[in-house]
From Swiss-Prot:
Pfam family, one: CutC
Recorded name of the encoding gene: cutC
HAMAP family assigned to the protein according to its UniProt record, in alphabetical order: CutC
Keywords tagged on the record: Cytoplasm
Any one annotated GO CC term: cytoplasm
UniProt cross-references to Gene3D superfamilies, sorted A to Z: Copper homeostasis (CutC) domain
Keyword Cytoplasm: yes
Upper taxonomic lineage: Bacteria, Pseudomonadati, Bacteroidota, Bacteroidia, Bacteroidales
Keyword Iron-sulfur included in the entry's annotation: no
Name assigned to this protein: PF03932 family protein CutC
Family note: Belongs to the CutC family.
Length: 249
């Protein structure tokens, strides 16, 4: 039987613990999920590290939402955040940088990789909006990254199966491809069988209603983007179990 690895995109310490309870091998801890994930706080990383005992902790290093073209100030911030993650005991970090032309930003990536020595490094879904994925794959391998998180440059990994399969063949064991975005208990087995990929990234979240008794629903904390303050999405152990069992059954 193939040895699969499962990473949960965790939006809180609560989600990290649910991932661990469900049998995940690793979590990617992120804040700012509506923006695609941003660097979590010192307190969140530290608490997750204290409470995770069997599940590895990776931390996204992304100073803001939006594109992956970073200013010198943002790069400086990322370097400090990598050092913070290291000091707090993270097992790995997750980042990715592009040039204005959609190429891998090699000078910035080299700087971040140097700062990440001793940590596992995942090049995140900046890969999915790069100009030339085949060329980028070779460059990321040369940089020394351990894995690439990708949906095959599509809205979901299921839609990206053709490119994921081609990239898995091209990689030929030189780097791990981590299939992510829209991976769930209904499609993980298909993605695995059609691509040959053995690592999967998913959120396994469910919507939880707030315990607030008093609610002022006329005010939104998200400005022009409406986010329901009286509902939140958290990973559940049962959905993690279901997703893992779907591929192992």
């Amino acid at each position: 039987m193939k040895k699969y690895q499962f990473e949960v995109c965790a939006n809180s310490v609560e989600s990290c613990l649910a991932a661990q309870a469900g049998g995940a091998d690793r979590v990617e801890l992120c804040a700012g999920i509506p923006e695609g994930g941003t660097t979590p706080s010192y307190g969140e990383i530290s608490t997750a590290r204290d409470m995770l005992t069997t599940t590895r902790l990776h931390v996204i290093i992304r100073p803001r939402g939006g594109d992956f073209l970073y200013s010198p100030i943002e790069v400086r911030t990322m370097l400090k955040d990598i050092e913070m993650a290291r000091q707090l005991g993270a097992d790995g970090v997750v980042f990715g940088c592009l040039t204005a032309n959609g190429e891998i930003d090699l000078p910035v990536m080299q700087e971040l990789m140097k700062a990440s020595q001793g940590l596992s490094v995942t090049f995140h879904r900046a890969f999915d909006i790069c100009r030339d994925p085949e060329k980028a794959l070779e460059q990321i391998i040369e940089l020394g990254c351990n894995r690439i998180l990708t949906s095959g440059q599509q809205a979901t990994a299921e839609l990206g199966i053709p490119l994921l399969k081609a990239l898995q063949t091209q990689a030929s064991g030189r780097i791990i491809l981590l299939a992510g975005c829209g991976v769930n208990e209904k499609n993980i087995a298909r993605i695995a069988s059609e691509t040959g990929i053995q690592e999967f990234h998913f959120s396994a979240r469910e919507s939880i209603k707030s315990d607030m008794k008093y609610k002022n629903e006329s005010v939104s904390m998200g400005g022009t983007v409406h986010i329901d303050e009286y509902e939140r999405n958290v990973t559940t152990a049962q959905r993690v179990i279901n997703t893992i069992q779907a591929i192992k059954s």
